[in-house]
Amino acid sequence: YKRQEVGVIDILVNNAGIIKRIPMCDMTADEFRQVVDVDLNAPFIVSKAVIPSMIKKGHGKIINICSMMSELGRETVSAYAAAKGGLKMLTRNICSEYGEYNIQCNGIGPGYIATPQTAPLREKQPDGSRHPFDQFIISKTPAARWGNPEDLQGPAAFLALSLIHI
């Protein structure tokens, strides 16, 4: 980033993410790299760029949007699960390396969120029924719905508060 254009960053939210739903043995190395580049390498690069100014100021907050896929695997999302698992560990590592400088790094690991990435799993079937995975999510979620991107605003805002030191 160009510091003169955006100024000093106190709070960084690494929220970019992509997914390619391809069985691992059908996925090319380039497709795997594309997912890892966006979901893991980009947060590393951006965090690395802002941490020195956070150290200089004596504080900073980094919030990484991870995924429940950092904890479990599922068919056709090997690159995504690997990248989000790596992001979870990068989050922990940033805490270990830079916590002494009052830089807090937290990860939010949401479940399934209704985004363009999950649209294929929410589409109605030709017979009008729900996609089997959509039925599964609805039946296993206490709110009986997919999460919305707005659902992440509260946790992110909480973690960004200056009073919070976790």
Summary of predicted features, one role per range:
Residues P23-M24, E31-V36, I137:
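Substrate-binding pocket helix/loop in short-chain dehydrogenase/reductase
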Residues P52, S96-E100:
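Alpha-helical segment proximal to the catalytic Tyr-Lys
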Residues S67:
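Residue(s) in the substrate-gating loop at a strand-loop-helix junction
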Residues S47, A83, T91:
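Active-site helix of classical SDR
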